[in-house]
């Protein structure tokens, strides 16, 4: 009996045989092999066995399901070759073995199906978070949409938590670095403040020294100025004392002494006035024979009581004449004989004596001290 397979089944069987490695035994014969297989009636499998085999072959394992769900990737295989007849032939030695194989095939397929069922693997964080939220997910796949949303939300929370922890860790490291820099800069600031205080103290000490030096300079300048002024005053006073003495000693022998004459003119009285000036001392001391000589304009020295003497100088004047002039007497007095003022006296002598002329004579009286 020949088993006829369609094109899809033939491709599937060719893929399986290629994976098992039996394809390379007779490549030349496989090309010339016919497509129909001649199997005995006892070796023909039943329909349900073929269905189970195909289901077991077509259903992927759990690991492949998880990988395909996380990262789907489609793999396409092109099968454009024919299968040889010898590759699919089965050589069974006995019927017992064939019966046992037919009896063990369903159990084996169930075990394989149980092993190949996809299981949901959760981490400890996911389990703890689900327990906190009071959610329960099944351990097998596939999951419903709500369960998938719950699982995604839980995983998103875990990712956010990890990212927050990482950001906190980085922030902590950054803050620690800033704190260390702040401590270092504060230490440097304290050192600089100490240096500034030291420099301020040095500046104050230098200012004190400068003030002391300025005070010393001012004192020295005041002392020098006072001493110089004192010396200058002494020199000026010495010069003032020496110059007049030198001038007087030089001029005493060479130049005649100049005497100033202070004159006073008495008012002329008429002859009819009974109160006329009488000079008894003059009448007693001046002789009569020398009256005309004295009246002619000569000088006469009269001794007054005490240490004073009077110089009488007679100058006849007309009634309408001007006051008498002052005459110096350098010949009579070579030395300063008169310490007091020289007073010119103008008087009208009495005519009873007979020695006064008609006119207004003037008399000069000069005091003379006799030491």
From Swiss-Prot:
Gene3D superfamilies: 1.20.5.170. Ubiquitously expressed. Expressed in dendritic cells (DC). Weakly expressed in monocytes (at protein level). Residues 248-371 are lumenal. The keyword Cytoplasm applies. Residues 1-230 are cytoplasmic. Keywords: Activator, Chemotaxis, Cytoplasm, DNA-binding, Endoplasmic reticulum, Glycoprotein, Golgi apparatus, Host-virus interaction, Membrane, Nucleus, Repeat, Repressor, Signal-anchor, Transcription, Transcription regulation, Transmembrane, Transmembrane helix, Unfolded protein response. Homodimer. Isoform 1 interacts with HCFC1; the interaction is required to stimulate CREB3 transcriptional activity. Isoform 1 interacts with CREBZF; the interaction occurs only in combination with HCFC1. Isoform 1 interacts (via central part and transmembrane region) with DCSTAMP (via C-terminus cytoplasmic domain). Isoform 1 interacts with OS9. Isoform 1 interacts (via leucine-zipper domain) with CREBRF (via leucine-zipper domain); the interaction occurs only after CREB3 activation and promotes CREB3 degradation. Isoform 1 interacts (via C-terminal domain) with CCR1. (Microbial infection) Interacts with the HCV core protein; homodimerization is prevented by the HCV core protein. Isoform 1 interacts (via leucine-zipper and transmembrane domains) with HIV-1 TMgp41 (via cytoplasmic domain); the interaction reduces CREB3 stability. Processed cyclic AMP-responsive element-binding protein 3 interacts with HIV-1 Tat. Endoplasmic reticulum (ER)-bound sequence-specific transcription factor that directly binds DNA and activates transcription. Plays a role in the unfolded protein response (UPR), promoting cell survival versus ER stress-induced apoptotic cell death. Also involved in cell proliferation, migration and differentiation, tumor suppression and inflammatory gene expression. Acts as a positive regulator of LKN-1/CCL15-induced chemotaxis signaling of leukocyte cell migration. Associates with chromatin to the HERPUD1 promoter. Also induces transcriptional activation of chemokine receptors. (Microbial infection) Plays a role in human immunodeficiency virus type 1 (HIV-1) virus protein expression. This is Cyclic AMP-responsive element-binding protein 3. The lineage of its organism: Eukaryota, Metazoa, Chordata, Craniata, Vertebrata.
């Amino acid at each position: 009996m020949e088993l006829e397979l369609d094109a899809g089944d033939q491709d599937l069987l060719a893929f399986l045989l290629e994976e098992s490695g039996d394809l390379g035994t007779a490549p030349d014969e496989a090309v010339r092999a016919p497509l129909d297989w001649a199997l005995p009636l006892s070796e023909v499998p039943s329909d349900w066995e073929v269905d189970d085999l195909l289901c077991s072959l077509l259903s992927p394992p759990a690991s492949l399901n998880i990988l395909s769900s996380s990262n789907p990737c489609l793999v396409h295989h092109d099968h454009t070759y024919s299968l040889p007849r010898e590759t699919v032939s089965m050589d069974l030695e006995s019927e017992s073995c064939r019966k046992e194989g037919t009896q063990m095939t369903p159990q084996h397929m169930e075990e394989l199906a149980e092993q190949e069922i996809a299981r949901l693997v959760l981490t400890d964080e996911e389990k703890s978070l689900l327990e906190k939220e009071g959610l329960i997910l099944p351990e097998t796949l596939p999951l419903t949409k709500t369960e998938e949303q719950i699982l995604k939300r839980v995983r998103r929370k875990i990712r956010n938590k990890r990212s927050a922890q990482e950001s906190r860790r980085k922030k902590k490291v950054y803050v620690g670095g800033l704190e260390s820099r702040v401590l270092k800069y504060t230490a440097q600031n304290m050192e600089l403040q100490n240096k500034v205080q030291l420099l301020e103290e040095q500046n104050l000490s230098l200012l004190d020294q400068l003030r002391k030096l300025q005070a010393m300079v001012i004192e020295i300048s005041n002392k020098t100025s006072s001493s110089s002024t004192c010396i200058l005053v002494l020199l000026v006073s010495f010069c003032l004392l020496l110059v007049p003495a030198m001038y007087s000693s030089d001029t005493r022998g060479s130049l005649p002494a100049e005497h100033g004459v202070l004159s006073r003119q008495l008012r002329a009285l008429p002859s009819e006035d009974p109160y006329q000036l009488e000079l008894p001392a003059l009448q007693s001391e001046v002789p009569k024979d020398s009256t005309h000589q004295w009246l002619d304009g000569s000088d006469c020295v009269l001794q007054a009581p005490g240490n004073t003497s009077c110089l009488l100088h007679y100058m006849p004047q007309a009634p309408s004449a001007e006051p008498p002039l002052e005459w110096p007497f350098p010949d009579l007095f070579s030395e300063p004989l008169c310490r007091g003022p020289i007073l010119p006296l103008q008087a009208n002598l009495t005519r009873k004596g007979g020695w006064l002329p008609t006119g207004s004579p003037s008399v000069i009286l000069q005091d003379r001290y006799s030491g």
